[in-house]
Regions:
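Generic structural signal for short, solvent-exposed loop/turn connectors between secondary structure elements
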Residues: 2-4, 26-31, 75-79, 88-91, ...
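Alpha-helical protein-protein interaction scaffolds
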Residues: 1-50
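Glycine-centered flexibility motif
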Residues: 49, 97-106, 191-198
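Catalytic core of non-heme Fe(II) oxygenases with the double-stranded beta-helix
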Residues: 115-125, 129-225, 233-236, 241-244
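Residue-level recognition of well-ordered secondary-structure positions
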Residues: 21, 38, 80-83, 125, ...
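Short, exposed beta-strand "edge-strand" segments with a Pro/Gly-rich flavor and a Y/T-containing core
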Residues: 64-70, 219-226
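Non-heme Fe(II)/2-oxoglutarate
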Residues: 53-143
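Conserved catalytic-core motifs of GNAT/GCN5-like acyltransferases
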Residues: 230
C-alpha cells in the first residue's frame, strides 16, 4: 500500500497525468487507504481540475477539529511540568529541516514514565475518541478504516520570535494533532503564530494553480486534530515569549 502510494506521488511529481489517472483508478478500485494517498489526490484535484475522490479523506479541510483541553482533563500543574521538561530537555533536541528558529525534542514523549506525560496522553486519547465519534456517517476512508490498535507518537516544538514550521503532512500517520502549551499574546490581532492548512504539497508541481489557504486561530490549551493527509504550516510570529 505505501509503495503504491509512493509511486502515485512520483507520477504526480513528474506531472505524468495519464499514468497518474490510471494508477489512481487502480488504487481506488483496491480501496487503498493511507494518508499519503489522501494528500496526493487532493493536490492532483487542484492542478488537474479533476474530482478524484480520496480513498482516505475527501475535502480534508472539513475535518479540522479545535477544542480546549481544560484543567479537569490536564491540570495546570501538569501543564507547567510539561513546559519545564521542554526547557530542560533542550540539550537532547534533534535537528528538524522543516523548523525555522525553533527546536524539537527527540524520541517519543510517550515512552517517558512521568506522571505529567501519562496525564497528557490520557487527555489526548479522550479527545481522539471524541474526534472519531464526531464524524460517524462521513463515509470517509480514514473513519471507516480506523485502526483497531494504534500507537501515539509525540514530541514538543518550541519556537522563538520569527519561528515557524514549513508546509508538510504526515504521510505515515493517520490523524495528526497539536496541543498548545503556551501561545504568546500578540500585539496586533493578525494571524501571527496560527496554523494554516492547504491541499498544496510542497514537493509537487503547482502548474500555476491557486491553492486556497485556510488559517485557524489557536490559543493556549487548544488541541487541533485533523487527518494526517492535510498539508499544514504555521505563520511566523513576533514575541518575547516562546510558542510551545
Amino acid at each position: 500500500n505505501s509503495c503504491q502510494s509512493l509511486y502515485l506521488g512520483c507520477l504526480l511529481s513528474l506531472n505524468r497525468e495519464k499514468d497518474f489517472n490510471e494508477k489512481y483508478k487502480e488504487l481506488a478500485d483496491k480501496k487503498a487507504c493511507n494518508s499519503d494517498i489522501g494528500g496526493i489526490v487532493e493536490h492532483a484535484n487542484i492542478i488537474y481540475g479533476k474530482k478524484y475522490t480520496s480513498t482516505f479523506c475527501h475535502e480534508s479541510i472539513n475535518y479540522v477539529f479545535i477544542e480546549k483541553i481544560n484543567e479537569e482533563l490536564f491540570s495546570e500543574n501538569d501543564l507547567k511540568e510539561l513546559i519545564s521538561y521542554s526547557k530542560m530537555s533542550k540539550k537532547e533536541d534533534r535537528s528538524q529541516g522543516l523548523l525555522e528558529n525553533g527546536i524539537q525534542t527527540s524520541g517519543n514523549l510517550f515512552s517517558l514514565d512521568y506522571p505529567f506525560i501519562k496525564s497528557i496522553q490520557k487527555a489526548l486519547e479522550i479527545k481522539i475518541e471524541k474526534y472519531k465519534k464526531k464524524f460517524p456517517n462521513s463515509g470517509q476512508g480514514f473513519i471507516n478504516n480506523w485502526p483497531k490498535n494504534y500507537e501515539l507518537s509525540a514530541w514538543m516544538i518550541s519556537m522563538k520570535t520569527g519561528g515557524f514550521l514549513k508546509s508538510h503532512n504526515h504521510e505515515y500517520g493517520w490523524i495528526t494533532g497539536s496541543f498548545y502549551l503556551q501561545i504568546p499574546k500578540y500585539k496586533n490581532n493578525d494571524d501571527s503564530g496560527n496554523i494554516a492548512f492547504s491541499y498544496q504539497g510542497p514537493r509537487y508541481p503547482n502548474k500555476g494553480k491557486n491553492f486556497n489557504l485556510t488559517i485557524k486561530k489557536i490559543e493556549t490549551r487548544d488541541i487541533c486534530i485533523f487527518p494526517s493527509s492535510l498539508f499544514h504550516h504555521t505563520i511566523p510570529f513576533n514575541s518575547s515569549e516562546e510558542r510551545i
